[in-house]
Amino acid sequence: MMLLKRCNRRALVALAAVLLLAACGGARELPDLSDVGDGVATETLWTASTGSGSASSAYALVPAVEGGRVYAADSNGRVTAWDAESGERLWRVDTGRELAAGPGAGGGLVLVGARDGRLLALDAENGEERWVSGLSSEILAVPQIARNIVVARSGDGRVYGLDGLTGRRLWIHDRSVPVLTLRGSSSPVVVGNRVVVGQDNGRLVTLNLQDGEVIWEAPVSIPRGRSDLERMVDLHADPLVFRGVAYAQAYQGELAAVGMGDGRERWSRDIPGHTGMAADSRQLYVVDDQSRLWALDRNNGATVWRQDRLQGLRLTAPVVIGGHLVLADEEGYLNWIAPDNGDLVGRDRHGRQPIQRPPVPDGDVLYLLSADGRLAALRLVED
């Protein structure tokens, strides 16, 4: 169920919208996929528990893999590090806060965001607190770090650049947000010296990492309709930057490809969604608002194929690994798709809890986090 947030006006309409969406979600009919076999073989290397898991589907709690370690957090404030190969637990700390986003990892730091707007930086070696910085509202996007600058986004749409050593604020990008938006935020993407951000107003912006100045801003989708609900065009899915092109998808709007050099639109398609994207050398893969998976030509946006058999399931963003395409779903399955033709070649279940965030690939290993906090490391078994 998609959650909404309302700014500066009565919450009654937002509540009604949530109830309406919940009612629609309750009436969903799950597809019959009993004829689909196991597909791509995997072996479980290890499993572990992060603690309590995620308290909300709006939270961006997702594993981070960095320097031979896996980091994960739970809603109750625990952050844990494991050895990526063996699954040995290296450390665990209790931050004492309700965590809603992260971890982001890099530069010797593990970064997590809290419901109260606090951004916490922990030492990657031992979990000790390095610094805490207060942002303007809850943090629902995974913090990033590059060139010793931490980039974080708060729920009110502000983007911050912070000193990685001290947490001191270096810059802030502030844009007004629409009256009604989806709860949750797309995470910023750092590419070189640029920060790419999908905004709640349907625009994609690229900032200078050093000072937060706008390099370019491009409209992905324009609000339409009379009501606040109809006019929602959040870029809720994380932007994807691949080979010099930024891809962004709007809720109730368009999917667009924008050149990173000049911010000019390359192509646009009417494929609304809020989940996320993946790409390989030929194709862009994207899930629409009906849980249909599309493969598009990256150069012109033309449809290569569309897979409709997963309609009715709540899917994660697709992930490309080892020549395969995989998506997790709310029933605890991994769904394996053939990239060439879109065939559903297999499904395998990893527990009965929803998988709300995409698996994290690292080489030939997938790290999978269920809503109850079960973390699994799976290795592809090639024939």
Curated annotation (Swiss-Prot):
* Gene Ontology cellular component terms for the protein in this record: cell outer membrane
**Keywords from the UniProt entry:** Cell outer membrane, Lipoprotein, Membrane, Palmitate, Signal
- Where does the signal sequence lie? 1-23
The UniProt entry, under InterPro entries, shows: BamB (IPR017687), PQQ_b-propeller_rpt (IPR018391), PQQ_rpt_dom (IPR002372), Quinoprotein_ADH-like_sf (IPR011047), WD40/YVTN_repeat-like_dom_sf (IPR015943)
Q: Where is the lipid attached (S-diacylglycerol cysteine)?
A: C24
| Topological type in the membrane | Lipid-anchor
Role description:
Part of the outer membrane protein assembly complex, which is involved in assembly and insertion of beta-barrel proteins into the outer membrane.
The name under which this protein is listed is Outer membrane protein assembly factor BamB
This protein's species is Alkalilimnicola ehrlichii (strain ATCC BAA-1101 / DSM 17681 / MLHE-1)
Lineage of the organism: Bacteria, Pseudomonadati, Pseudomonadota, Gammaproteobacteria, Chromatiales
